[in-house]
UniProtKB/Swiss-Prot annotation:
Serine protease inhibitor. SUPFAM superfamilies: BPTI-like (SSF57362). Residues 1-24 form the signal peptide. This is Kunitz-type serine protease inhibitor kunitoxin-Tel1. Expressed by the venom gland. Disulfide bonds join C31-C81, C40-C64, C56-C77. One of its GO terms (cellular component) is extracellular space. Residues 31-81 form the BPTI/Kunitz inhibitor domain. InterPro entries: Kunitz_BPTI, Kunitz_BPTI_sf, Prtase_inh_Kunz-CS, TFPI/VKTCI-like. It comes from Telescopus dhara.
Length: 90
């Protein structure tokens, strides 16, 4: 196989690995908790992972307590719950 073919194959394998859905075993358990705005009354725009839609969605956070399924940015939610780094076998 030519070096160009090997590079194409490597690129396709990398893309496939990134697009393969994450198994629930790699996702922290708190990602499956429901959105919880907490008892306080601040109105902060936060994000939580919705396990039904497999997406990070916006909710209004009260500013205190709640649970760990609570992220200041959609990117952090996505990195943690949608596409966490995969564990590599040793």
């Amino acid at each position: 196989m030519s070096s160009g073919g090997l590079l194409l194959l490597l690129g396709l394998l990398t893309l496939w690995a990134e697009l393969t859905p994450v198994s629930g075993q790699d996702r922290p358990k708190y990602c499956d908790l429901p959105a919880d705005s907490g008892p306080c009354r601040a109105r902060k725009r936060h994000f939580y992972y919705n396990s039904r839609s497999n997406q990070c969605e916006e909710f209004t956070y009260g500013g205190c307590r709640g649970n760990e399924n609570n992220f200041e940015t959609k990117d952090k939610c996505h990195y943690t719950c949608v596409a966490p780094p995969r564990r590599r076998p040793l």
